[in-house]
Amino acid sequence: FEDDWSDVPACDVVFASRCLEVDDLKTALGKLLSKTEKSLYITFKVGGSFVDEEILGAIGRKVEQKPDFVYLLNILFQMGYLPSLSYIKSPCSAGPATSAEEFVQKTRWGLGGELSSAEEARLAEYFNSGKCAPKQEFMHWAFVWVDKTDKF
């Protein structure tokens, strides 16, 4: 979203799926809406983190929860739009980890690629302790859409 969008054409419909974990959500939404003629469709996570609190506790890490879809709705409303909302319930298709190595890899992905060697060791120990059980079978996503003609 930091790139120059001057060459990006405006379109009737714009989709932004799972890409709005940005520092300045209002600016990103402004860019998307500037290229939207009719409708903007967005998927955004429900909840503040991709990693379970118990796993974070096992590695001794506090993660600053990022705003979830409610923040997105509030910004759109402040911008004068009346966003619509629905939910998508999607199975966690990756399934539970079958090895400590896979568990570490999945946790690393959920934390944006950053794990120290000490955290990796604690994760492996946690996995091998047998205490590690998948908490949720589904991931919930907010499906938000804006009709650009529906402003107040």
Predicted feature locations:
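Conserved beta-strand signature within the Rossmann-like core of class I S-adenosyl-L-methionine
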Residues: 36-51
